[in-house]
Structure formats: C-alpha cells, structure tokens
C-alpha cells in the first residue's frame, strides 16, 4: 500500500519501550512517522487538558532514529495530539496510533486511559485511530503488538474506515505461538476496590496514595452483539481483543460497515 503519514503518541512517555517499538515498526514498513508524546509518564490522566500552564515541546529525534521525527511535550496525551495536529505537523496524518501501552486498557478502564484519550483526539478530528496496549505491566516484548496493530490499521484503511470509529486493541502477555485468534469484543465493566494509603510528611501534613484492585469483571457493558465476548475474557484466554468504540463510547453503527478484520 501507499506509505501512510502516521502520528504516534502514548501516555507512558517518550522514553517508553512500547512507543519506540511501535514507531520503529511503522517506519520499517516505509510509513512516514512522527512521534508527539509526553516527556514523562502520564498514565491514567484520561482526557485531561493543560489550560493553566504553558505546554513546552522539545525535539527528541535522537531517541528514535531511522528518520522518525519526535517531540516530548510537557502536556497530557490529549494535549500532545492536539498540539501535533495544530502546530507541529505540516500535514494532517492518515492514521494516529496511541501506545504501545505498558499495561491493559480494558472495559471501563478506558474512561481514565491517557492512551485511549490520545487516540480519541484523532477520532474527534476525523482521523482513523487505534489505541494499542499490552495487557501486562511486566511484559517487555512489544514486537508482536507493533506488527498486529499495523496489520489492523493498514487493512482497515484499505477498507474505508467508518466515521467515528476508534479501535481499542489489547494484546495478552504471551508469546505469539501461544496466542489465540484476534476477535471482536465488547467492553467489560470493571469494578474496583479503591484503597487509599494515609501518610504524614516531615512537616506533619497528611497526604494520600491511591491504589485500587479490580475485584469484579462483569461480562459486558451491555452494548454490541451478544455473541461477542468481553475484552477481559479474551485476554484471560490469551487472545487479542479488538473493541470498536466511538466518542459516545460504543460503536452503534451498521455492523456491515465494520472493516473485515477477523
């Protein structure tokens, strides 16, 4: 296919292995790649925007090489994509990829996901966009995730990407030979047991660390074909999960319009 102009962002920051793998994978296929992402870890920032302080962008080409242009920005993931589209890029991209995230973005986790928010900025601007995550914080082999996300993107673009469709791809932490087939999935509802750790600083002021653990994964948020499994259940059986969402969160369009990816 003709080389694509691809914008890549994330919420793990410019030094994360996932985004470097994704950018290198895209460039190796001949695509023109630009990276605009946070200059440090900004996970779980959701769709937050920076309105009360300046956003600074510093060139970071040397972190990627291979002709990839890159910036590290002081803003949120959503800030980064907005800045790229309105100031840093000479041309509108054909595709936006967000990730590869270090950790899952499953079910209702997408509400607080900076990875999904960055991709959603592209969807809101009419650009085909995919959020890509490896469903483990410890897994460090991102090569298959990079390959699969680009295979999906290229195939979907060739089939005329439907308006308002955002694809949320989660890949299980296992070797490719052990992995099941990619399938369409529905969003799970993830319920957490929230925990706050109370501490006191050297000046006697109380502060808190928030932690939470998923204690219940309901089968589905109730939208989509009933024959589709939930995204959480797919990852649990070591199979990649591909969930179509849109700005009001679930794809409610004509199912015949979905790209033929499975």
From Swiss-Prot:
This is 5'-nucleotidase SurE. It is an enzyme of class 3 (hydrolase). It is found in: Cytoplasm. Its EC number is 3.1.3.5. Its main location: cytoplasm. A divalent metal cation binds at residues 11-12, 43, 101. Keywords: Cytoplasm, Hydrolase, Metal-binding, Nucleotide-binding. Binds 1 divalent metal cation per subunit. GO terms for molecular function: 3'-nucleotidase activity; 5'-nucleotidase activity; exopolyphosphatase activity; metal ion binding; nucleotide binding. Belongs to the SurE nucleotidase family. It holds the Pfam family SurE. It catalyses: a ribonucleoside 5'-phosphate + H2O = a ribonucleoside + phosphate. InterPro entries: SurE (IPR030048), SurE-like_Pase/nucleotidase (IPR002828), SurE-like_sf (IPR036523). The keyword Metal-binding applies. It comes from Prochlorococcus marinus (strain NATL1A). It comes from the Bacteria. Its cofactor is a divalent metal cation. Coiled coil: none annotated. GO terms for cellular component: cytoplasm. Nucleotidase that shows phosphatase activity on nucleoside 5'-monophosphates.
């Amino acid at each position: 296919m003709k080389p694509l102009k691809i914008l890549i962002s994330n919420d793990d920051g410019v030094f994360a292995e996932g985004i470097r793998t994704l950018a290198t994978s895209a460039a190796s296929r001949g695509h023109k790649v630009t990276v605009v992402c946070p200059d440090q870890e900004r996970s779980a920032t959701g769709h937050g925007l920076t309105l009360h302080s300046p956003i600074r962008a510093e060139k970071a080409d040397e972190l990627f090489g291979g002709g990839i242009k890159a910036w590290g920005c002081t803003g949120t993931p959503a800030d980064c994509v907005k800045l790229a589209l309105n100031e840093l890029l000479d041309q509108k991209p054909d595709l936006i990829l967000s990730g590869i995230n270090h950790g899952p973005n499953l079910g209702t986790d997408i509400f607080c996901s900076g990875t999904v928010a960055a991709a959603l900025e592209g969807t809101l601007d009419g650009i085909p966009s995919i959020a890509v995550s490896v469903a483990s914080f410890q897994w460090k082999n991102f090569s298959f995730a990079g390959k699969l996300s680009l295979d999906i993107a290229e195939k979907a673009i060739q089939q005329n990407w439907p308006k308002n469709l955002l694809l949320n791809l989660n890949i299980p932490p296992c070797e490719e030979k052990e992995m099941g087939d990619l399938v369409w999935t529905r969003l799970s509802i993830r319920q957490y047991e929230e925990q706050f750790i109370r501490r006191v600083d050297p000046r006697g002021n109380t502060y808190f660390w928030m932690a939470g653990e998923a204690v219940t994964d309901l089968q589905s948020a109730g939208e989509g074909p009933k024959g589709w499994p939930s995204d959480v259940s797919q990852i649990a059986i070591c199979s990649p999960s591909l969930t179509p969402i849109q700005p009001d969160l679930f794809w409610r369009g004509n199912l015949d319009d979905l790209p033929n990816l499975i």
